[in-house]
Design a protein with these regions (language model features):
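N-terminal subdomain of nucleotide-sugar transferases
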Residues: 2-74, 416
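A conserved mid-protein helix/loop that constitutes part of the nucleotide-sugar donor-binding site
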Residues: 36, 242-265, 278-284
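Membrane-proximal helix-turn-helix segments that form the acceptor-binding/catalytic region
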Residues: 40-43, 110, 153, 168-199
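Donor nucleotide-sugar binding/catalytic pocket of nucleotide-sugar-dependent glycosyltransferases
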Residues: 77-79, 147, 178-233, 411
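Nucleotide-activated donor-binding/catalytic signature segment of Leloir-type glycosyltransferases, i.e.
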Residues: 284-302, 306
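Short hydrophobic beta-strand element within catalytic cores of glycosyltransferases
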Residues: 317, 331, 340-343
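Aromatic "clamp/platform" in nucleotide-sugar-dependent glycosyltransferases that forms part
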Residues: 323
Length: 417
């Protein structure tokens, strides 16, 4: 039984506030990427009104453990939905997970329709796994519909295909064909664009990828949000040698091959790589071929605490030359520690706050990245997307788009003792 099945009637002062029904397939506290976005954005919405979140049954334990400790708990209600155990085999691999997700949406839609019979929702919101070429079923519900933050619009710059390796190049060709086909042939992709009253997109490329008639209702709003108390700002300790840090999956499109080439141009620097993935073997071979293997440390998968330690004390720059990241949770985490970020001027990282280097072919881009790394080292970072600042901005957008709705007063974070 879900939390909302057992709770008493809500306090009278919240009854007049907006009621939001959220589809958040991924939603887990203390996580990055999509699960973290589902949790933090649900909390942000609960600062403005009453929120019902439909998520996976597998998320129940961690959500119920964390919920009592968050100040928005009284306005958050979770409904847990999953497919029968015999259908779980679909989740094997990335493609299988997408198939499973489509069927999960059918089950979530059934639960949402039952909820809508008992509760009049002001907004229906497709929150996580919002992919512009995958789509969703949430807009089939009555009422105003908000879609996003949506990703999926960042394409490949084919000038960089030579740094991907054969497997990476094949993946990019398949991805490009899938994106093109889904845009024109997938009715589930077109449905949210058409029905949305507001579309939030993670980056400018995704807004440009939408059909022109839908772009005027799309705003750039990255889904990356850092919780209060997650910043480690302050004077950064001196490091004995200059070190660039990369954190992420070791996949060809993540751009680690570019980072290794940058190291060739920076003989006084080292590179620490945190993450694992199938591209690691190729990257180790490349480091040997470039004669930089003695200045590269492959650390494998790292715990969040270890990542934060490296950001705070062991690095001078986060070098994140991803070729088509929609967001990049690690960008916000680095900025929160005061670590400067150097990235390509593509997709989500520069929208979050990274220093974006224009893409002008491999050699020119590598040289520009090297110069940006040297310039960024020791430079103070700007702000980062906290849950408070993002909540204030989001409420301003919603008030403008939906003036008839009733919102709670702008939230102020509790003072730390």
């Amino acid at each position: 039984m879900s939390r909302s099945d057992t709770e008493p009637d809500h306090a009278g002062e919240r009854r007049s506030l907006m009621r939001v029904l959220v589809f958040a397939y991924a939603c887990e506290p203390d996580k990055g990427s999509e699960p973290g976005a589902g949790w933090v954005w649900s909390r942000m919405l609960a600062r403005m009104g009453e929120v019902w979140v439909i998520t996976r049954e597998s998320n129940r334990e961690v959500i119920e453990a964390a919920l009592p400790s968050v100040p928005e708990a009284g306005a958050l209600h979770f409904e847990y939905v999953d497919l029968p155990r015999r259908a779980r085999f679909w989740k094997r691999g990335a493609r299988g997970a997408r198939v499973y997700y489509v069927f999960w949406q059918v089950a979530a839609l059934r639960r949402a329709r039952r909820l809508s019979q008992a509760i009049s929702f002001d907004l229906v919101w497709h929150l996580t796994w919002a992919n512009a070429w995958l789509g969703g079923l949430a807009p089939l519900l009555p009422g105003r519909f908000v879609y996003g933050p949506v990703g999926g619009g960042v394409g490949m710059d084919w000038n960089f295909v030579t740094v991907l390796g054969i497997r990476g190049a094949v993946f990019e060709v398949a991805r490009a064909l899938s994106r093109a086909g889904a845009r024109f042939l997938n009715p589930l992709a077109r449905l949210p664009w058409r029905r949305a009253d507001l579309i939030l997109v993670q980056n400018p490329e995704t807004r440009a990828w939408l059909p022109a008639r839908h772009r005027e209702k799309a705003l750039v709003f990255p889904h990356i949000v850092v919780e209060e108390g997650a910043g480690w700002m302050g004077p950064r300790p001196e490091t004995p040698t200059k070190n660039a840090l990369f954190v992420g999956r070791l996949l060809p499109w993540k751009g680690v091959a570019l980072a290794l080439r940058v190291l060739v141009l920076l003989p006084d620097w080292t590179l620490t790589i945190g993450g694992d993935g199938y591209d690691e073997r190729r990257l180790r071979r490349l480091a040997r071929r470039l004669k930089v293997e003695d200045r590269v440390a492959f650390l494998g998968w790292l715990t969040p605490d270890r990542v934060h330690d490296l950001m705070r004390e062991g690095s001078d720059v986060l070098l994140f030359p991803s070729l088509h990241d929609e967001g990049g949770w690690v960008i916000a985490e680095a900025l929160a520690t005061g670590l400067p970020v150097v990235c390509l001027d593509r997709g989500g990282p520069p929208a979050i706050g990274g220093s974006g280097v224009p893409c002008k072919g491999v050699s020119q881009t590598v040289a520009a990245l090297a110069q940006a790394v040297v310039t960024a080292a020791g430079r103070a970072t700007g702000g980062f997307p906290s849950i408070h600042s993002s909540s204030v901005r989001l409420q301003s957008i919603l008030r403008s788009r939906f003036p008839a709705l009733s919102f709670a007063e702008t939230w102020s974070p509790p003072m730390e003792s």
